[in-house]
Amino acid sequence: MNRCWALFLSLCCYLRLVSAEGDPIPEELYEMLSDHSIRSFDDLQRLLHGDSLDEDGAELDLNLTRSHSGGELESLSRGRRSLGSPTVAEPAVIAECKTRTEVSEISRRLIDRTNANFLVWPPCVEVQRCSGCCNNRNVQCRPTQVQDRKVQVKKIEIVRKKKIFKKATVTLVDHLACRCETVMARAVTRTPGSSQEQRAARTPQTRVTIRTVRVRRPPKGKHRKFKHTHDKTALKETLGA
């Protein structure tokens, strides 16, 4: 019993010393001391360590939130700087004339042109083709050496709703070497009358046949009064009179 009282007095002295030196003592601690829950020095240590752990946890959470918020703000500021600041453009490099890997489609015409009721597998393969640009517009990248390569594909026929697998051979063309070659333009010689002749040759001619239809008029009959007169001179004199 005396030990408990001594413990209680030492705790009160410690609390007063702490309140005088630092922050005020919370009222929750007084309530826990007034209660009979503290019966030994171990209970007091648990109480003090529990409060310190809670405070340390709160400080740790606060530090973490500050660090996260600071990191997010820093990342946002970096993002704004990167968006706002102009990016450094790298120099352009010409695509030189050389062989490159391209994708070529295997159509059904390469296997069988008479039948369309089948599938080809694989539908496309890789080939080597010349590509690139040259220094002049009059020069193009063209292959100087080619090689035929045979590949085996599957021909899947559908007969009476059943699949029949067959093998077929397709010949592919690979480019081995490339070079920029001059494009030869066709020489066009023009003569003074050639332009009109070329235009006449280009424009399609349509033949138009015109048929003249003669309409037969009924013969002019003489007046009944002058039927008996056959002499034209006498008839003219009679009409003139």
From Swiss-Prot:
Signal peptide: 1-20
Keyword Metal-binding assigned: no
Keywords: Cleavage on pair of basic residues, Developmental protein, Disulfide bond, Glycoprotein, Growth factor, Mitogen, Proto-oncogene, Secreted, Signal
GO molecular-function term, one example from the UniProt record: platelet-derived growth factor receptor binding
InterPro entries linked to this entry: Cystine-knot_cytokine, PD_growth_factor_CS, PDGF/VEGF_dom, PDGF_N
CDD domains: PDGF
Subcellular location: Secreted
Record-annotated site: Involved in receptor binding: 108, 111
Gene Ontology, cellular component aspect: basolateral plasma membrane; cell surface; cytoplasm; extracellular space
Residues annotated as glycosylated: 63
Basic residues composition bias: residue spans: 217-230
Disulfide linkage: 97-141, 130-178, 134-180
Region annotation (Disordered) ranges: 217-241
GO biological process: cell chemotaxis; cellular response to mycophenolic acid; embryonic placenta development; heart development; metanephric glomerular mesangial cell development; monocyte chemotaxis; negative regulation of gene expression; negative regulation of phosphatidylinositol biosynthetic process
Propeptide, chain numbering: 21-81, 191-241
Quaternary structure (record): Antiparallel homodimer; disulfide-linked. Antiparallel heterodimer with PDGFA; disulfide-linked. The PDGFB homodimer interacts with PDGFRA and PDGFRB homodimers, and with heterodimers formed by PDGFRA and PDGFRB. The heterodimer composed of PDGFA and PDGFB interacts with PDGFRB homodimers, and with heterodimers formed by PDGFRA and PDGFRB. Interacts with XLKD1. Interacts with LRP1. Interacts with SORL1 (via the N-terminal ectodomain). Interacts with CD82; this interaction inhibits PDGFB-mediated signaling pathway.
Function: Growth factor that plays an essential role in the regulation of embryonic development, cell proliferation, cell migration, survival and chemotaxis. Potent mitogen for cells of mesenchymal origin. Required for normal proliferation and recruitment of pericytes and vascular smooth muscle cells in the central nervous system, skin, lung, heart and placenta. Required for normal blood vessel development, and for normal development of kidney glomeruli. Plays an important role in wound healing. Signaling is modulated by the formation of heterodimers with PDGFA.
Family according to the record: Belongs to the PDGF/VEGF growth factor family.
Protein name per Swiss-Prot or TrEMBL: Platelet-derived growth factor subunit B
Lineage of source species: Eukaryota, Metazoa, Chordata, Craniata, Vertebrata
The gene coding this protein: PDGFB
